[in-house]
Each structure stands twice: as C-alpha cells, then as structure tokens.
UniProtKB/Swiss-Prot annotation:
Motif 'KMSKS' region positions after renumbering to this chain: 270-274
Protein name in UniProt: Cysteine--tRNA ligase
Co-factor requirement: Zn(2+)
Positions of ATP binding: K273
Molecular-function annotations in GO: ATP binding; cysteine-tRNA ligase activity; zinc ion binding
Example GO BP: cysteinyl-tRNA aminoacylation
Binding site for Zn(2+): C28, C213, H238, E242
Subunit structure: Monomer.
InterPro entries documented for this protein: Cys-tRNA-ligase, Cys-tRNA-synt_Ia_DALR, Cys-tRNA/MSH_ligase, CysS_C, Rossmann-like_a/b/a_fold, tRNA-synt_1_cat_dom, tRNAsynth_Ia_anticodon-bd
Length: 469
C-alpha cells in the first residue's frame, strides 16, 4: 500500500483514493511572466513522477494544473516591454511547453488558464459573500480569514503572529479597506485603465491569486480531491488560503492529501527569480546536450528533500545515467544471440529488485531508495551480459525491467541510444565480417570511421559492441 507524507497532519498516511482505482490530482502551475527555472522544473518533475508511479500502480490519474496568466508580475512585465498582458502570458505559457517537452513531463489531463474561468471565479466570490465569508470594500473583495475555523493549520501558522506580520506589511489604505490585516483578496479592483480587468458585480477588476486554483480544482476535478501538490513555499499563504475559501464555499474537506516538494538550492539558498540566483530551463536546454540528465537529477532526489544544484551535480547525474544506459546496452546487444529459455536464479533476482523498487516508492515516493534498486538491476545486467551464454527470456525480462522502472522516473530513451543510421549499421556489419576473416587493418579503419561519426566500438569476448560518444 502507498503511504504519503501529508503536510496537513505532518505524518505519513496510508493512501486511500476517494474513488477506488482513480486519483484526482491538482498541482499548482507557473505564473507565466518569465521562463521557468530549475526550481520550477523540480516541482513539475516531482509530481510527474508521483503521477507516473500512481499510474504504474494501476490508478487512472486525472491530473489538473494551471497557468496563472493574470498577476501583478505579468502586469509589470507587460509595462516594461510595452505590450499587453496576454502577449506576455502567451509567450511564456508557450515557453513552458517548449521547455517541459524535452524533460518528458507528461501533459496535464487539463491545463487551464486563470483567465479561462473568470465567470466561475466571480460566481465563487459571490457565494463567499452570500455565506458571510467575504466582503466588498472599495471594489476589492476580501475573505474573512478568522471566520474560517482552523485558518493557518496547514502551515502551522499562529493567528496572532500572522496578524502582526500582515499589519507590518500593509499601508494605511490597505489597513482601512480590510476588516482585519490577515484578510486576503479574492477579487482586486482595477486601479488603472491600461490594466487587464473584467466587469464584475463589484466593478472592473481581476481575481486574487489564491482563488484561481480553488476554482480550477473544483471545476475540473471535484469539491473534494485526493491530492494537491506544489512547492513547500506555497503552503502559506497560497494553499492555506485555498483551503479556507474552498471549504467555506462547499462545507467539505477540500483536499485529502497535501504534498509539497522541497526547494532547489544554490549555495544553500533557495533558487528564486527574486534572489536572482536562478538558472532557467530554457538556458540549460540551449547549452546542455542531454535533457534526460537534467530530468534524472531532479527525479531521483526524494521529492520532499532539497536539492543543492551545481554543475558538478549534473555531471554526477550524467555519470549515473550512463551506467544505467551501459548496462541496458550490454544486455540488449546479447539478445540477438541469446539461447531460448530462461535462468531461474536471475529471474528471481529481477523480481526481487522490482519488489524493492515498489517498496521504496510506496514509502512516500522515495526515489532515492528506488534508484538503488535500479542499480542492483544494473549490477545483475552487467554480470549477466558477461556470461558466455545467456537466455532470451531472461535477457528480455531484464531490459524490460530496467526500462519500465526508469520510465516511472520519466527517464526514457534507453533504446533510443541504440539506434543507428543505415550507413553506420552497414559499417558495423562490414567490420564484423572483416574481423571474421582476420582483416584487422580494415577493422581498425572502420572503427576509426565510426568514431568520426560519433560511434565508439568495443570488442569483447561476447562480440562487437558500440555506443554513442
């Protein structure tokens, strides 16, 4: 059984889906005013791995995520560039897709923009006002935080401390408009004619950030959902406010399991755009030749733990991934000459390590322990490939096991590294023939020719092997 760490309870809990065999999952997406950085990608990949493992375990996952495409940061960026807000939002929403496709992040079942649900947001706010949880003030609409019992419990925030901190951040006008400093905006009045806005019962304005996710989760999933994910920095105030407004409206539990991923750190500081210590995925993909190495690094650290990012961590990830690819390749090349049948002891070891992988992933998606099981399969693969004789069923089972488990991490393409052009394949075949008649001069010439094409050839006791440089 899968157990997950629920931020709300601060405990690992057995996972029980609301509907057996199906999971409703919402994950906060980016505010589209810039290219995503590695920290943003870490969150997207962490929950992509969780989704993949749930699917591997037999669940059908309805995965919803969003683009926040109306926000102060987007408005500011639009003013700086002299364009309208939707031009900025469209540009960086498209960039998100372009950056996440090479990282093999599965498309959401539904990816909604906040601006696509404005009527739903207005109806949601009207319900909150009707129930006494929200009030209009000078065109803004605020949520009465203290009216909601348990406000702040997700992030273990103390009300008095929150009130003091909020009061210190607000100017006199904001303090005058609010009944209480910790009340938060669910609708913001428009204060400029050149600012994006919509007509509402309270005048022209736009939604507050927090209400957007509440509306989309309920619209595309349900009033109560199984899993809500996001970075740990979203626990307060974003997810705290989502809980308050969602449960105030429906009277039902909003989310059964709250999951939060850890930061990506640079020199022990959180990577963020505000600190200016970020590296965009866009830049990394432009300068790094293998996106799966980036994916591997971000996928194989347990999702709640921080990642210290540095160039040498990428090189370590590259080396580890190459070990896996090499082991896969070693067995793959033996399949064509393998004997019919299977080896019971190796089959048993394969099944044992698949079971260990599942045990690790069942324990709050512990990818660090799960990858250790894959490296046990790597050892088995290398040892098996070095035998004088191997069996077809076992060799096939071994390559499938490695590929299937790596696919849970979203690190695919093991077999893609074994594809060749027709020209390269012809040279390899010619080299086999040359060695068969002991024409080693021609064999060496062909090896050099293949090397110039980026293909490294090795001669082993089991025959010729190759890999891309």
């Amino acid at each position: 059984m899968i157990h997950v760490y629920n931020t709300l309870s601060r405990e690992k809990e057995a996972f029980h889906a609301i509907t057996p065999g199906k999971v409703n999952m919402y994950v906060c997406g980016p505010t589209v005013y810039n290219y995503i950085h590695i920290g943003n990608a870490r969150s997207a990949i962490a929950f992509d791995v969780i989704r993949r493992y749930l699917e591997y375990s037999g669940y059908v996952v309805n995965y919803v995520s969003n683009f926040t495409d109306v926000d102060d940061k987007i408005i500011q960026r639009a003013r700086e560039e002299g364009v309208d807000e939707m031009t900025i939002a469209d540009k960086y929403a498209q960039a998100f897709d372009e950056d996440t496709i090479p990282l093999n992040i599965k498309p959401a079942t539904t990816r909604s923009r906040a601006t696509a649900v404005i009527p739903d947001i207005i109806a949601f706010v009207e319900d909150l006002i009707h129930k006494g949880y929200a009030y209009e003030s000078a065109g803004d609409v605020y949520f009465r935080a203290k009216k909601f019992k348990g406000y702040g419990i997700l992030a273990h925030q103390d009300l008095a401390e929150m009130e003091a901190n909020a009061a210190g951040r607000l100017d006199d006008q904001e303090l005058t408009r609010k009944e209480d400093p910790i009340d938060f905006a669910v609708w913001k009045a428009s204060h400029s004619s050149d600012e994006i806005s919509w007509v509402s019962p309270w005048g022209k304005g736009r939604p507050g950030w927090h209400i957007e996710c509440s509306v989309m989760a309920q619209k595309y999933l349900a009033d109560t959902i199984d899993i809500h994910g996001g970075g740990i920095d979203l626990a307060f105030p974003h997810h705290t406010n989502e809980i308050a407004q969602s449960e105030a409206r429906t009277g039902q539990t909003f989310v059964n399991y709250w999951l939060h991923n850890g930061f990506v750190n640079v020199n022990d500081e959180k990577m963020s755009k505000s600190l200016g210590n970020f590296t965009t995925v866009h830049d990394m993909l432009a300068h790094y030749d293998d996106p799966m190495v980036i994916r591997y690094l971000l996928a194989t650290t347990q999702y709640r733990r921080p990642i210290n990012y540095a160039p040498d961590t990428l090189e370590q990830a590259r080396a580890e991934l190459e070990r896996i690819r090499t082991a896969y390749r070693n067995v793959f090349f033996r399949i064509s000459t393998a004997k019919t049948g299977h080896d019971d002891s190796v089959d048993y070891a394969i099944a044992e390590h698949i079971s260990h992988f599942r045990e690790a992933m069942d324990d709050d998606f512990n990818t660090q322990n799960a990858i250790a099981s894959i490296f046990e399969l790597v050892t088995i693969a290398n040892n098996y490939a070095s035998r004088d004789e191997i069996k077809l069923d076992t060799a096939t089972r071994l390559t499938h096991a490695i590929a299937d488990l790596m696919n849970v991490f979203g690190v695919n393409g093991l077999s893609e590294h074994l594809t060749l052009s027709a020209e390269a394949q012809a040279l390899l075949d010619k080299r086999v023939q040359a060695r068969a008649v002991r024409d080693f001069n021609l064999s060496d010439q062909l090896r050099d020719q293949l090397s110039d094409m980026g293909i490294i050839v090795e001669d082993t006791t089991q025959g010729q092997r190759w890999h891309h440089a």
